[in-house]
Amino acid sequence: MSDNKSTGDSGKLLYCSFCGKSQHEVRKLIAGPSVYVCDECVELCNDIIREEIKEISPKQDQDKLPTPHELRAHLDDYVIGQEKAKKVLSVAVYNHYKRLKNAGPKDGVELGKSNILLIGPTGSGKTLLAETLARFLNVPFTMADATTLTEAGYVGEDVENIIQKLLQKCDYDVEKAQRGIVYIDEIDKISRKSDNPSITRDVSGEGVQQALLKLIEGTIAAVPPQGGRKHPQQEFLQVDTSKILFVCGGAFSGLEKVIEQRSHTGTGIGFGAQVKGEDDKATISDTLMQVEPEDLVKYGLIPEFIGRLPVLATLAELDDAALIQILSEPKNALTKQFAALFEMEDVELEFREDALKAIALKAKTRKTGARGLRSIVEGILLDIMYDLPSTDNVAKVVIDESVVKGESTPILIYENSESQAASAEQ
């Protein structure tokens, strides 16, 4: 019950029954049967309820851990090809979250952490694989670019900033962040320039590898709370990185030469050498499948860093057939995305088979893989997306090979004619 105190001339002054503040000290006072509650107390109650829900939800998520088969099936819906990499990732991710679910040593055996290293050319699906799994598991996901990282104390981004980004993704909920997935791209760019230790300081190469070691293996990272250094009086958040799954990826351009050099050692020189013909030469993707940890050391990664990434998966370069599939088959395929965009204008969008082949050929020529497909399609549809909102009675837009090659404009089919087709005019 609130104590209603008289203010004299102004009558009764109302007070919050919980905190005791008067109606003049708060923005809103909600009245009940002989009880009053202020807006500040309502907000406080909401915060308490939210915190309790957060504590319960991670346990519920753990009970619903998908099997490797289910993880693989979900990846198949969004990622074309890369079958071996999907299987490796599904098993590694399942084992990681199974380890978290059964925390503590099992019969005296402490389960190690299985971070992942993905090797594959640009646009082969490294980032997409990690991101798709994180979305399916409903865990926080963040990306970091290894080329922007430097050792602490130097100009650049500290490795601890990676954990801060992860915390930002889950509104600084430490428990949730500790179940997250971190993808570090361009990991090959921090390789040292030679496999001999350098006497000079390498703050963006070997130095970053050294800085990442503990973070990836598992340590208690001290991260500034929301607001960072602007509020130095606040305590730092303690994040246990041993529960975070780290996935590192890179193109590792030139690694195939290191592998070939190793595999050809001992085949003889001069007249005793085994000369390989054109038919014997393996593709770059086939060569990368034979990668060993010693090849990565020769490439420039330090042995300790490779040891923290025990799960290795190699992704093949996407061929024309795979690129065509990527354009049309996944749940979020580009053609489906743009078809949905055109549907908002009540217009049907059709890509003919020859158009898909021409788009795939363009991406192959640019050597951008699947990553370059969107920019190509955006360029093809730019003019028609500009004109369509101002054009009446268009029922369908058709894209064929000549449109992709820039030889003609998209075919427009109008509502008021069953078979009328006309080129889009500026």
Swiss-Prot record:
Residues reported in the UniProt entry to bind ATP: 121-128
GO function term, MF aspect, one: ATP hydrolysis activity
Positions annotated to bind Zn(2+): 16, 19, 38, 41
Domain ClpX-type ZB positions: 4-57
Keyword ATP-binding appears in the UniProt entry: yes
Top-level taxonomic group: Bacteria
GO biological process: cell division; proteolysis involved in protein catabolic process
SUPFAM superfamilies given in the database record: Glucocorticoid receptor-like (DNA-binding domain), P-loop containing nucleoside triphosphate hydrolases
Keyword set includes Protein transport: no
Family per similarity comment: Belongs to the ClpX chaperone family.
Function: ATP-dependent specificity component of the Clp protease. It directs the protease to specific substrates. Can perform chaperone functions in the absence of ClpP.
Subunit structure: Component of the ClpX-ClpP complex. Forms a hexameric ring that, in the presence of ATP, binds to fourteen ClpP subunits assembled into a disk-like structure with a central cavity, resembling the structure of eukaryotic proteasomes.
Protein name, per record: ATP-dependent Clp protease ATP-binding subunit ClpX
Organism: Shewanella woodyi (strain ATCC 51908 / MS32)
Taxonomic lineage: Bacteria, Pseudomonadati, Pseudomonadota, Gammaproteobacteria, Alteromonadales
